[in-house]
Design a protein with these regions (language model features):
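N-terminal leader/targeting segments and the immediately adjacent pre-domain N-terminus
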Residues: 1-79, 106, 110, 139
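Flexible glycine/proline-enriched surface loops and loop-helix/loop-strand junctions
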Residues: 81-83, 177-183, 193-195, 232-239
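Catalytic cores of extracellular degradative/oxidative enzymes
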Residues: 120-124, 143, 147-167, 174-181, ...
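Solvent-exposed, acidic/flexible segments
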Residues: 43, 47, 57-58, 85-93, ...
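Active-site helix/loop module of the DD-peptidase/beta-lactamase fold
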Residues: 107-145, 175-178, 205-241, 245
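Active-site SXXK
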Residues: 68, 87-112, 137, 197-201, ...
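Non-transmembrane alpha-helical segments in soluble domains
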Residues: 51-54, 102, 118, 135-138, ...
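Active-site-proximal alpha-helical segments within enzyme catalytic domains
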Residues: 193-200, 239-262
Length: 263
C-alpha cells in the first residue's frame, strides 16, 4: 500500500500536473501534435479479469492484449482516466526513437548500426560523440554517461524548465566534453545517448523523430488515436521522454514489436 500511495502522488504530480500541461502546450516545453486521420479499431478478445495486477490507486490506465486482441482494460476514474486520454509514455519514448532508427536502417538510410553516428550527422561529428557507433547509442554504451548525477540538469535544459530558450538538444550534446570509458564496455542508463540518436534521425531525414515515427512506424501499429511529442526550440523531438498516445496504442505498439521480433 505504501508503494501505491507513492505511485498515486506521482501520477497526480506528473501525469495530471506538469506532463499534462506540457501535452496541452501550457507548460514551458514545446509540443508537436500529429493527427491520425485514419483511426483503426483494436480487435477485442475474450475478456480476462486482471484486476489483481492492475487495480491499484496509482494505476492510471492499463490495457492487456493476447494474440493481438484486447483482453483487459481499466481506466482509473478517480484519476480522470478514460480511453481517449493520451498518456505520457515517459521513458518508453526512448523505445519509439529506437524503432525510428530501425526504420532508417531497414530502408537503407543507415548502412550499418556499427557505423559512427557522425557519418550521418554533422552536429555529432562536432561533439564528443564523433566516434560513437549507432549501436552503442542505442545500447547506451557510449562511455560518456558515467552515472545519472548530471541527468536532471540536462533534462531540465532540454525541457526548457528554465523557460529561457536554452532547450536546444544539439547545444546540450556539444556542452558535454568528457568520457569515462571506451564505448561498448558498459551500458549506463542516461538521457544523453538517446538524445544523440534523436539528433541523428533529424539530420539524416531533415525531419523530427516524431514526424518520421508518425509517418512510417505509427501506421503499422494500427493506431486508434493521434500522438503528441515534446520538442526543443528547433522542433527537434526529445528522445528521453515526451511521447503521448492512447493507452490502447501503447499496447498496440508493444504488440507490433512482438510481431516484428517473432517474424
Amino acid at each position: 500500500s505504501a508503494f501505491a500511495d507513492v505511485d498515486k502522488r506521482y501520477v497526480k504530480k506528473r501525469m495530471l500536473g506538469v506532463d499534462l500541461s506540457s501535452r496541452d502546450g501550457k507548460g514551458p516545453t514545446p509540443v508537436t501534435f500529429f493527427e491520425n486521420k485514419s483511426p483503426k479499431k483494436t480487435e477485442q478478445g475474450e475478456k480476462l479479469n486482471l484486476d489483481k495486477f492492475f487495480k491499484a490507486p496509482g494505476n492510471f490506465s492499463a490495457v492487456a492484449m493476447k494474440d493481438g486482441k484486447i483482453v483487459y482494460e481499466r481506466y482509473n476514474k478517480k484519476l480522470k482516466a478514460n480511453p481517449d486520454f493520451h498518456a505520457h509514455g515517459l521513458s518508453l519514448t526512448k523505445t519509439a526513437v529506437g524503432l525510428t532508427v530501425g526504420h532508417l536502417l531497414c530502408t537503407g538510410k543507415i548502412n550499418s548500426l556499427d557505423d559512427a553516428a557522425s557519418n550521418y550527422s554533422q552536429s555529432l561529428n562536432n561533439s564528443i560523440y564523433k566516434d560513437i557507433t549507432i549501436r552503442n547509442l542505442l545500447r547506451m554504451a557510449s562511455g560518456i554517461n558515467k552515472n545519472r548525477d548530471n541527468e536532471r540538469k540536462f533534462n531540465h535544459l532540454m525541457r526548457n524548465r528554465r523557460d529561457n530558450g536554452t532547450n536546444n538538444l544539439i547545444e546540450v550534446i556539444k556542452s558535454v566534453k568528457t568520457k569515462f570509458s571506451d564505448q561498448g564496455e558498459i551500458s549506463r542508463y542516461h538521457s544523453l545517448d538517446i538524445t544523440a540518436a534523436s539528433i541523428l534521425v533529424s539530420e539524416i531525414t531533415n525531419k523530427s523523430v516524431a514526424e518520421v515515427f508518425f509517418n512510417n512506424v505509427f501506421p503499422q501499429i494500427n493506431p486508434e488515436g493521434s500522438l503528441y511529442w515534446w520538442v526543443d526550440n528547433n522542433k527537434m523531438s526529445l528522445g528521453m521522454a515526451g511521447l503521448y498516445m492512447k493507452t490502447k496504442d501503447w499496447a498496440n505498439l508493444g504488440n507490433y514489436m512482438n510481431k516484428e521480433i517473432t517474424s
